Amino acid sequence: KLKILDIGGGAGETAKKLVILGHDVTIVVPSKILSERCVENTKGKAQVHKTQFEDYQPEKGQSFDVCLFSESFQYIPAKIALEKSKTLLNKNGTILIADCFRSEEKNNSHNRRPGGGHPLSEVRALIKELNLKIISEKEITKSVAPSLDIEQQFYNMMGFAFDRIRQGLLANHPIKTKIFHFFYNIFLN
């Protein structure tokens, strides 16, 4: 039975599977809606903290066997994520990161590249600086590349269409469009 800190645990789907396997799971997620979903999905068997990882305070003396970043590492400053995780681990603990990273490859296209992530070279330098070591690494770019190509094509097509609609609305209904943008930014940012 492992004590696992699921950082940025989404709706709790991964935590649900880990709880079923018998692990002790604590979830840190910044969204009220997602934190409620985590409680539902784990049937209350995981501790759920509605906070950003940067602000998370464990119970006194609490440490973890695993700090899990499942597609969440890219949203936290890398140095903070690694330093804080290191302090939360027990003696033989592991930081597990399953996420996207930026390569050094140049993007000569005018199109936005899909995906996010910290530059891999910077993360490697931080790992060395913090005296951490990589015990396993798996490159899956080739297996996800077809999906990324589809996402890029969709983004190019829909992005162009939405931009044209926005320009038309702004030209014909500038006040309504500005009011819409104001409320959109309040509720979705």
Across the structure, where does each feature detected by a protein language model lie?
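Class I SAM-dependent methyltransferase SAM/SAH-binding core
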Residues: 12-56
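Short "lid" loop at the C-terminus of a central beta-strand within the Rossmann-like core
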Residues: 100-105, 139-142
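A short acidic, Gly/Pro-enriched loop at the edge of an enzyme's catalytic core
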Residues: 56-67
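Substrate-binding/catalytic lobe of Class I Rossmann-like enzymes that use SAM or dcSAM, i.e.
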Residues: 111-188
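A short glycine-rich, Lys/Arg-flanked "PGG" loop and its adjoining helix->strand segment in the class I
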Residues: 80-91
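A short SAM/SAH-binding and catalytic strip from SAM-dependent methyltransferases
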Residues: 66-78
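Conserved beta-strand signature within the Rossmann-like core of class I S-adenosyl-L-methionine
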Residues: 93-100
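Conserved class I S-adenosyl-L-methionine
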Residues: 2-10
